[in-house]
Amino acid sequence: MKLSPSAGGVSDQPPSPPEVAEEQKCLNSELWHACAGPLVSLPAVGSRVVYFPQGHSEQVAASTNKEMESQIPNYPNLPPQLICQLHNVTMHADAETDEVYAQMTLQPLSPQELKDPFLPAELGTASKQPTNYFCKTLTASDTSTHGGFSVPRRAAEKVFPPLDFTQQPPAQELMAKDLHGNEWKFRHIFRGQPKRHLLTTGWSVFVSAKRLVAGDSVLFIWNDSNQLLLGIRRANRPQTVMPSSVLSSDSMHIGLLAAAAHAASTNSRFTIFYNPRASPSEFVIPLAKYVKAVYHTRISVGMRFRMLFETEESSVRRYMGTITGISDLDPVRWMNSHWRSVKVGWDESTAGERQPRVSLWEIEPLTTFPMYPSPFPLRLKRPWPTGLPSLYGGKEDDLASSLMWLRDSQNTGFQSLNFGGLGMSPWMQPRLDSSLLGLQPDMYQTIAAAAALQNTTKQVSPAMLQFQQPQNIVGRSSLLSSQILQQAQPQFQQMYHQNINGNSIQGHSQPEYLQQPLQHCQSFNEQKPQLQPQQQQQESHQQQPQHQQMQQQKHLSNFQTVPNALSVFSQLSSTPQSTPSTLQTVSPFSQQHNFPDTNISCLSPSNVSSMHDTLRSFPSEAASDLPGVPRITPVPVSDPWSSKRVAVESTITSRPHDISSQIENFDLTPSSIPQNSTLAPLPGRECLVDQDGSSDPQNHFLFGVNIDSQSLLMQDGIPSLHNENSSSTIPYSTSNFLSPSQDDYPLSQTLTTPGCLDESGYVPCSDNADQVKRPHATFVKVYKSGTVGRLLDITRFSSYHELRSEVGRLFGLEGQLEDPLRSGWQLVFVDREDDVLLVGDDPWQEFVNSVSCIKILSPQEVQQMGKPGIELFSTSARRLGNSCDNYMSRQESRSLSTGIASVGSVEF
């Protein structure tokens, strides 16, 4: 069925192709948009839109002057908002009335398409509004048969071709085309007392043919092709009697609801008609516009806003109002709908013509902090570790509620949408890092990597390189990685030939204990058969230059599956008879090379306990020969949101001949080096590294391993293996790793006995970290324009919330700094590297260790701030050498008042 366009019906079948082709041929897009109105913008073909059946019903009610009856059946399967793909848009104009309308072909998205990530690049294609035009509402004299059309002087000089004033009277012939391509001729003359521009001959014919009356509007457009276009807008006059050819109002309501419900259940296409002049509001809007308004704007009762309205002269004007309520327009039939969910009150006395309810995407709140798009050039300097408290020191629920206004909590369809590209913060998407749940495996791998360091050549063992993910090494690190592998290749071959005889002797006894079931990583082993072909294919390409040598090692195929670094435990045992039992317990972990960021199946708490059992079975005699590994050193990473990679600052004992003899027994063949191994991250604030890769000149680290010749040997052998004052548990607050229950994980008793390493060298607790980063309490200067700066002991606080509360109390801004998204007040700080960052971007301890001074930005400074202001702010701090007492001189304050930028939402 095809309904009257004026009624905005729904059709399952589009009009016939000849009819569409004929209308498209005669239609001018610029003229159509001019007749539709300055606020009308059709979505782009191929984009995703949100269709509101509730708004479609309003168009039918406005066209038929009859609201939807209560006896109309309800469609429970039809959601209040339907996300669709826009396949086609066709602009039409009624042949008799010149009423413009658009025909859209929509197709609801499938559940799978709703889950796919969608990154809208625009908020809809802006309609091509004419720039050189004028619009006039006809008066009674303009529509009289004996008169003419009076054109305002300024409009005639702007749109019409210039008159020849040498003639008396000046006159010319004008030819204009309407929407259907019909040409209309008028005589343009400049006469009268006072003189004015008139359209005389041909005007009365045009008025009679179009049946124009007083109140209708006429548009004249001079386009880029030097053509004069003519359009009309009829005044909204509800029809008192509907023609018999048009379906009843109830039938139209039922038809559009049934068509939409059928399309939603079958994911089939359906066609709608949109009449911009008859519809109170747009009911098909771009998805990006909907997401911006609903998920990126926070409103509340009492908030001021402004809204655009069309004027009589086809221009726009902003009207001010106040939000008086937030609720569903029809909670019975359309529950959790965003259509006209905001009750408003208008300021002006003419507000009777305005709607008492509006939609979120129609208004512009005045007190909401700008969040989308963000003009602020700051980014996160350091990666935010998974599981840490959220931005403003509260719970993640508080952060989510401050960043978006989500009313359709019952609508699972919108919860499944991925709007990460629209400004949503990455920590709003909860992620469980499996490697953060298990702490002890990092220690084992750290010990093994340190022991595999070759002392004689000052090169990093490939057993250490296997723990570094190749694609996570940036810039110089990737280049150095390839150079080291090339330099170490001849050494691998030489060591392989030296040890092939010894390995062949051990090869007969190894399968006896290598065939034990892998009970502790069953979830990984279930995936291993799919991973083996890829690993074998990679190894085949790497082993082609050494094909002949590899033929001699066929009897060691079972032993090649054990990673080199983890097999160090068996080689470092002082008693040969303990090797089988040790390797038997280590082998289950040797199959687990990769630690994905979001997979928690391998390193569950049960596996952590099994690792404790493994370490308990490790003999103390073997542990006594292990070299000591001092504190962890960060490794630069490329992805700011990837897991923190453990960097091993390893040193070797003062017995080089013992280590050399042990290294000779290692199987360092390239075939035994996994190429896709990833070292699990060790949580802690010291693992957060600067993305610029800056480091101390005295630190000589390659992939996190100290290659300084002076630090390769430890002077006094292994350090103290036990600290009596250390706790046997890792507190959640100090370790900063993710725990769903926020409980403390007990350390293995083996680690706290005198026979093994002290955990203080691996777990960066608050005590030893503060000794390194901040040896004494630090007072930070806090600045605010127009007031005297205050000194603040930053170490007194434990969260951003406490800091914001205290700063607000000191400067009389109580409640303003805790909610910057609403108040507009922002805190920025200068770190010790002269970078300007938002307070709250970094984890709390990183902020404490790096803050140099803090600046309070007023809403005016926030709005004025831009990239030049950021550069000026940073340059001033660098010139003054981080001396916060002299940081804000009067002259610089005067410059910053015009240059300090707006701190919109931080983009990631």
Curated annotation (Swiss-Prot):
- One matching Pfam family is ARF_AD
Query: Which GO biological process annotations does it have?
Result: auxin-activated signaling pathway; regulation of DNA-templated transcription
Report where it is expressed, by tissue: Expressed in roots, culms, leaves and young panicles.
Keyword Heme appears in the UniProt entry = no
DNA-binding region at which residues?
134-236
* Annotated spans, Disordered: 1-21, 525-556
Skewed-composition ranges (Low complexity): 526-556
UniProt-annotated location(s): Nucleus
Task: Give any Gene Ontology cellular component.
Answer: nucleus
Q: Which GO terms describe its molecular function?
A: DNA binding
PB1 domain sequence ranges: 777-861
Which keywords does the record carry?
Auxin signaling pathway, DNA-binding, Nucleus, Transcription, Transcription regulation
**Which InterPro entries does the UniProt entry name for this protein?**
ARF_dom (IPR010525), ARF_plant (IPR044835), AUX/IAA_dom (IPR033389), B3_DNA-bd (IPR003340), DNA-bd_pseudobarrel_sf (IPR015300), PB1-like (IPR053793)
Which protein family is named in the record? Answer: Belongs to the ARF family.
Subunit text: Homodimers and heterodimers.
Reproduce the free-text note on domains from the UniProt record.
Interactions between auxin response factors (ARFs) and Aux/IAA proteins occur through their C-terminal dimerization domains III and IV.
Question: What task does this protein carry out?
Answer: Auxin response factors (ARFs) are transcriptional factors that bind specifically to the DNA sequence 5'-TGTCTC-3' found in the auxin-responsive promoter elements (AuxREs).
Tell me what this protein is called. Answer: Auxin response factor 6
Species, as recorded: Oryza sativa subsp. japonica (Rice)
* Taxonomic lineage from the root: Eukaryota, Viridiplantae, Streptophyta, Embryophyta, Tracheophyta
